[in-house]
Amino acid sequence: MKQNRIVLGVAALVAAVMLPWPALGQEVGQQTVPDKESPAEKESEKPADKAAEHQASDKKTDGDWGFRWDGRPSLHLGEGTRVDFRVRLQSEIWHSDATLSLDDDSDADNDLSADVARRRIGIEGEILNIFDYQVERELTANRDPWRDVYLNYKQYGFAEVMAGKFKVPFSLDENTSSTNLDFVNRSRIATLLAPGRDVGVMVHGRFLPRGILRYELGLFNEDGSNAERNDTDYVHGDRTVAGRLLVQPFRSRKSVANDLAAGVSFTTSELPEGVSGLRGRTELDEWFYRPEVLVNGRRQRIGVEARWRPGPFSVKSEFIRLTDERLGESIEGTDLSPFLGQGWYVSGTWAVTGEKKAEGLDAPLRPLFRGPFFKGWIGAVELAARAERIRFGSVDSEISGAVPSTAPRAEIVLGNSDRAYTFGVNWYANRWIKIQLNLVRNTIGFPDQGPNPEQSSFWSRIVRFQFSM
């Protein structure tokens, strides 16, 4: 309830800042860093997206007012102030060789299933060239319907300030918008170990020539939406400090390496005493690890990431390690080895139709139905592959004489793991329509904890249909 009040307060502040001031946009708010990127949540949004959407805006006369089409409906309220209206629809069809129980009332196994994954509406834009803002709501969510609700002060590119509800600055994959993902689902480490969204405040910006060094540092109410559970018996991190540092050493050069980036990130949280909410699920939300481990102390994350997008290709990789302390949780009241979740992924893509990955494939070179005489082609086609692994257990997994156990106060926690290989094809018909097909091979370390105790490896097939404007 408190979080909802904060979110609604930020939304009201956005409206209050916008309405009285549109005529002043001609005189204030010039950015100090001309090539700076948008806020942290849009870290992975392609430069071509912004350029294409606001090409008309660059050509307008000073103080232009009214509705226009900038790739989506947009209301302009003078120079430097606009409201873009956004709609995002995503539906999925899937089938798995494993025994699925997404519908507890269903008696049929391995049936083809379908769902509307996202139905979101929202607004975003600028105010006087010195603020960015976004307000987005999920139409079908009964719990936590507000997604991104923030205001970002961007007048000084080396020290911008964002406040509201947005994604904690941790993990490249988690901070990539769902409309821009290379696969239907994020990696397991991003989904299960990264924080996700929370209410907080963050300072971020770029340093050094051409902004080759980027930082993000924030303070958040809790440990993020990914860590929350409906059952209040499970605990997650309270007040959280998070930071991320990203370097692009060749950003100022016109070379194939100018997009190469590497970064590190961390979070640290107070962790109240209770049962850890850390769990293991497959991409189809089937449990493969549900421990009842008592924790107490601090929750800490470290992450390492790298990305390179030369021409039509891309390569991305991450490593994430999360630990929950277990202070005083033994039967004798002594400390136990921290509870651990960690993993990695490596992924690659190839735009076979020739588009440059760093500039975005949602603006195909020859989109389907491009003009009034249909001089388009098939759009953009992309091949993708990803290998990943996530595992859970204790930090000290080899203590002499200790036997792994599922007991809440076990000295060594019995863990589990999931190794997955994903193969995908992405079709970008035009800037609004995208279809993704994924074939996934999962291998559960201890299948008796997974969706099918008699089957350690299984295939899943997923198709996503997306409309985004």
Can you name each region flagged by the protein language model?
Residues 46-47, 56-62, 99, 108, ...:
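Outer-membrane beta-barrel pore domains
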Residues 21-90, 97-102, 212, 356-370, ...:
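N-terminal periplasmic/intermembrane-space "pro-region" immediately following the signal or transit peptide
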Residues 9-20:
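Bacterial N-terminal signal peptides
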Residues 18-20, 96, 173, 326:
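N-terminal low-complexity, intrinsically disordered patches enriched in charged
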Residues 26-28, 33-53, 75, 158-161, ...:
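Glycine/serine-rich loop-strand microenvironments at binding/catalytic pocket rims
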Residues 71-272, 340-375, 380-397:
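Outer membrane beta-barrel
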Residues 1-10:
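Bacterial N-terminal signal peptides that target proteins for export
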